[in-house]
Amino acid sequence: MRIAMVSYEVYPFAKVGGLADVVGALPKYLERQNINVDIYMPYHKKVKQNAEKYGWAIEKITEKVDASMLRTEEKFEIYKTMLPGTKEVNVFLINNEYYFNADEVYAGPDLAEQAIFFSYSVIEAIRKLNFEYDIVHVNDWQTALIPVYLKTVFRDDPLLSKIATVLTIHNLGYQGIFEPEYLRFAGLPDYLYNIDGIEFYGKINFLKGGIIFSDIINTVSPTYAKEIQQKEYGEKLEGVLRARSSDLYGILNGIDYEEFNPLTDNKIYVNYDLNTIEKKKENKKLLQKELGLPERDVPMFGMINRLVDQKGLDIMAEIMDYVSLFDIQFVLLGTGEEKYENMFKKLGEKYPEKYSINLKFDIVLAQKIYAGCDMFLMPSRYEPCGLGQMYSLRYGTIPIVRYTGGLADTVKEYNPETKEGNGFGFEGFDPAHLLKAMARAIYFYNSKEDWNTLIKNAMTMDLSWDKSAKEYVKLYQRAKSKVQR
């Protein structure tokens, strides 16, 4: 089976969020299942900078190609490289100086035109290279028009008509909603502008188009796949998603066990595994030392997040004065809304012996937090999958979460009688429930037997991409069978 995977960001070439981690890791594990994968992404300015920095070999494989159907004079070139850590996963880079020359990945002169240009260019690239794919796997709204093109404009194309499509929704909150005139720029038929097409409250919705026209849709956790069919989480697309419920699946993201391994991780202070778990305490002491916190055996909470409402910062704000009364330490890493940055700054200034506030992005410090902290906080309002809790489990750092989306699928409440469970959580999105979950974690931290059991349960979970890749193979087979009928 041959797959074309399409994404705006791919680790290590360009990374903004979790999407890059997914598309950077999944092909590696699909390759081990004997699936042939090619990746298509924009040749962002960031990719060019990283290529120069890390010395990646990137070759130009075509001269300029017309985007003939679009209302633009712009053309594109195709470059090629390899995904590190794979035998033959090719990465095809769509180059255009006008659309992909911004300093940031999700920036440019016109985000709608940019997404249309990229989506159309990927299809033209497949035609130019004459590759026969079984599946085109697209990710999020930026690439969601590809299934629309394939099922309308290119439905009779001999090379493209047999391709099945899979759309992965990583976060339904981002949909690509724009003015209707972009339909003309895209060269898509006018009849799509209706309630059963991509019309959306007087505008057009790229993600809605992908949901309607893809053969199979999936989200990044089973719970989130159910949640988005409800009004509370559906972002006004719950009806469209319910209409496709028989083709909607949830597959948990995995984590790259080679990249995130406390036994071999060169970013942490001291390597360890379950058999040498006492060395985790050395990581804690060295983290305290680096951050200027007193070297004390008290519960240390870690949090690595964008500081925004979605991540539960609004309910955290209401309890931090109470939390400050506990004999604990708290390490924050992240940036975001000014009101939350200011709140944490003030806490750090008021309680320097308890709070280490790091308002930045630092991949090395992140690993040290996963390894050195005792507990990891993720009180999210909603969380399609979440990777932070998986990294923390892998490093034996016990998650405290709100049971939503992927957090509900990966974290199970600890039961001291059965000794089952790997963390603590709460369901109602309010400050009192969060505070109680934190208090339960502190209580069991003081019971050495229970805490060691929690660490063991956490570190023996299978959160690898191997498991998830097998689920994606089944998904591809389902999509393929729909086209072959």
UniProtKB/Swiss-Prot annotation:
GO biological-process terms attached to the record: glycogen biosynthetic process
SUPFAM superfamilies hit by this protein: UDP-Glycosyltransferase/glycogen phosphorylase
Binding site for ADP-alpha-D-glucose: 15
InterPro entries to which the protein is assigned, alphabetical: Glyco_trans_1 (IPR001296), GS/SS (IPR011835), Starch_synth_cat_dom (IPR013534)
Keyword rRNA processing: no
Pathway info: Glycan biosynthesis; glycogen biosynthesis
Transferase is among the record's keywords: yes
Molecular function terms, GO-annotated: alpha-1,4-glucan glucosyltransferase (ADP-glucose donor) activity; alpha-1,4-glucan glucosyltransferase (UDP-glucose donor) activity
Catalysis performed (reactions): [(1->4)-alpha-D-glucosyl](n) + ADP-alpha-D-glucose = [(1->4)-alpha-D-glucosyl](n+1) + ADP + H(+)
Entry-linked HAMAP family: Glycogen_synth (MF_00484)
Summary of the function given for this chain in its UniProt record: Synthesizes alpha-1,4-glucan chains using ADP-glucose.
Family note: Belongs to the glycosyltransferase 1 family. Bacterial/plant glycogen synthase subfamily.
NCBIfam families assigned: glgA
Record protein name field: Glycogen synthase
Organism: Fervidobacterium nodosum (strain ATCC 35602 / DSM 5306 / Rt17-B1)
